[in-house]
Structures are given as C-alpha cells and as structure tokens.
A protein has these predicted regions:
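Active-site and NAD+-binding cores of ADP-ribose-processing enzymes
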Residues: 1-122
Length: 122
C-alpha cells in the first residue's frame, strides 16, 4: 500500500473524563483490551456519552508497553477551538510492517511495528 499522509494533533481537553485503567473500571480490563472485539468498548462509549462524559482514558491494546490513549467523545471536550500542535506523518502499511514516518528538518522520526499487532489471532 502506498504511503498516505495522516494529520495528528495535540489538543487541550477540559471535560469530565473516566479512566478505564483505574478502579472501578479496571476490574473489567479483559473487556476493554480485546484486540479482536470492540463490542464492550462501544457499549461503554454509548453509556458514557449518555452520562455526559466527554472523554475516556484507556490503555493501548496494540502497544506492547500498553501506553495510554485518550478518546474524545464530544467536540465540547476541547478546551480551545484549535489544536496546540499539528504534525503530518506518512503511514505505510504492508503485509508484514506498519511504518509511521515524519519528515522534519529538525526532528525526523520513524516508528515501525509488525503488522501482526493489527491482525486477528488465528
């Protein structure tokens, strides 16, 4: 697959947030961390929106280090009308590898992952 540009951004969020990594939600960790079934997360997202929650913190399912992620559920969650920072990254996907590349004169970056992190287990 040819490289495709992706815009990533950093923004300030000011809203009611729940963290699935903390009690009482952590007891259902198996529901939130299934790489092949998002049903539990989708049901939680619907309930969170209905309860007026603006964002959800959770652990990455595919990051081997289980880094934190932030899902914004409403545009009202953003504290400012514009992002603090934007970057353009090139995404390349092959059968075996996923590569993110950022070409920047002062700070070029590249992150490469095995595609198996995104495939369903057999």
């Amino acid at each position: 697959m040819p490289s495709r540009p992706q815009t990533v951004f950093r923004a300030k969020v000011a809203t009611t947030t729940v963290d699935l990594r903390e009690a009482p939600f952590r007891r259902d960790r198996a529901t939130w961390t299934r790489p092949d079934d998002y049903t539990g997360c989708q049901h939680f997202g619907v309930a969170a929106r209905e309860a007026g929650i603006g964002a959800v913190r959770y652990e990455s399912v595919r990051d081997p280090l289980h880094g934190g992620c932030h899902a914004v559920l409403s545009p009202r969650a953003f504290a400012r009308p514009a992002p603090i920072e934007q970057q353009t990254w090139m995404l390349s996907v092959s059968r075996d590898r996923v590569v993110w590349q950022r070409t920047h004169a002062l700070k070029p970056e590249e992150h490469e992952f095995p595609a198996s992190l995104w495939t369903r287990p057999s």
